[in-house]
């Protein structure tokens, strides 16, 4: 994959739009999950305060960029929230941003050994250059720098495998190359869930649940046209990449994919 610095900047700015995309507009509809598997509870734990302490999230900047945080969201960032992670349209923006921060900063085999590791223009991608709510710099300053989670080698392996085979309708890149906010966020979510014991099947279901939350129109289309797909199949390049969705789903379903949610 070859790209010049200027081309990378143009791509990143085109994806991010007017700056950091924080999920100011959430499309209507609940997540659509064909072939749903019941998932174990997932918890934030001390992820929030660890991200804040590392400077990946500056709470004041995040509040300003998003127009404010709820009391529950503030409690999550302080580490005072003890309930399960809620996954619904009201939580969509906060999930996107917090998982984005985690996927960006967490030291991982995906970032250290995947295509991002040799991508010279990584600092100018939407997932890095678009992250402007860190304390000390843009997203590339934190990229693959912090041990927020302590993943075992087996957990790293399962995340790498699922990241290699999950796509998003805004581009043709797998989660293994998290070049936008959605890719980085899904990586962070997979890492957190794997660290809490999720197996491969459960990770695919979680990934589909989140993707369908962030791209509701696209996954409504997939569910309507291909109701019998497993989560792993629905997330494959054939259906969930931009070109795959356009080829196999868009002919029958109106919709569009954008990192601007």
Which stretches of residues belong to each language-model region?
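Acidic/His-rich structured neighborhood in mature extracellular/periplasmic domains
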Residues: 36-184, 199-202
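Hydrophobic membrane-insertion alpha-helices, especially the h-region
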Residues: 12-24
